[in-house]
Amino acid sequence: MMTTTFINGMDISFLDEIEQGGGAYYSGAEESVENAEDLLYILKDNGVNAIRLRIWNDPPGGFCNLERTLIMAKRIKEAGLNFLLDFHYSDKWADPANQSKPKAWENLDFTGLTSAVYEYTREVVELLKSQGTMPDMVQIGNEITPGMLWNEGKVDGEWDTTEQWEQFITLVQAGIAGAKAAASDLSVMIHIDRGADHPASRNFYDRFFEHGVNFDVIGLSFYSWWHGTLDDLRSNLNELAERYNKDIIVVETAYPWTLNAPEGFPLIVSEEKQLHEGYPATVEGQTNYMKDFISVIENIPDGKGIGFYYWEPAWIPSQKEWSVGHENGWSNLTLFDFAGGKLDSLEF
């Protein structure tokens, strides 16, 4: 179970690949090999108390699979940090645009798919438990607003039917049951991407409550350039807390510290018009944005806002080729400079 301490979390799922590719991190002014430090301890020394990792079933690039997750989990726990495990139930990114099944599950019928979700989830949690690195929380699926494990669990567009929702929820419940079979007191999060969209958030979670899905935490993504303003976020989070009486975590967020791209690297956020009003793309602007963002969560009624996770704050442009098959467009949305030096915004 997670502690009651406010979660200052970071998703650093790329760390394993960055380190193996020669990337390094520094908390001091001297960014040289002999001054490199373990990222986990830099984060911890600056107020971070929890780490999120994604897990893919059989990723082509070999990172974020079970074997590598077991290794990273040991490092997280050795550093004295809490651990959130993010099941994608895919061999690659699972998000609102893609929720493809693992290749090994493609030909299973629905009963077989449901069983596979249960057994895989149980096995992963049991293996983590057996090596003394039990997650403090798991999330069943990643940004599953449109469902997961398409097409059996797809619920957007023409797939938004009663039958499809029942199948989707059956798959989610199989994941929850698998996690609970391995650890009955394990906290479970259900994560969607609509941090500032109350009608969509309510439509989704109403379905889960109507079906009696047993979960502990509402998880939301919030990126201002895609989702809206901090006022929009505040309104949605406060209404969700009142409606469902569940703990809430904003489990993905980020903000730029510059709009200047490192040479040869495109950026997802590269224009002034993508910025939130009042927060320039500077280290100071990023710092102020994060302070105000955290304040929104801390002030959710009845203490229901229990924390946040910053998505890939350490995805520095240390290499051109990545196992995920696309470029790094995130290097100005980090809490480290392009060379791996800690920014002043990394203080919680």
Q: What do the PLM-derived regions correspond to, one by one?
A:
Residues Q20, S27, G157-E158, S235, ...:
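Aromatic-rich peripheral "rim/lid" segments of glycoside hydrolase catalytic domains that contact
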Residues M10, L43, D86, V124, ...:
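Conserved, mostly hydrophobic/aromatic
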Residues I12-G21, F83-D95, I248-G264, I306, ...:
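Short, solvent-exposed beta-strand-terminating loops
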Residues E19, G23-E34, N57-E67, T145-M148, ...:
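Acidic-and-aromatic substrate-binding clefts and catalytic sites of carbohydrate-active enzymes
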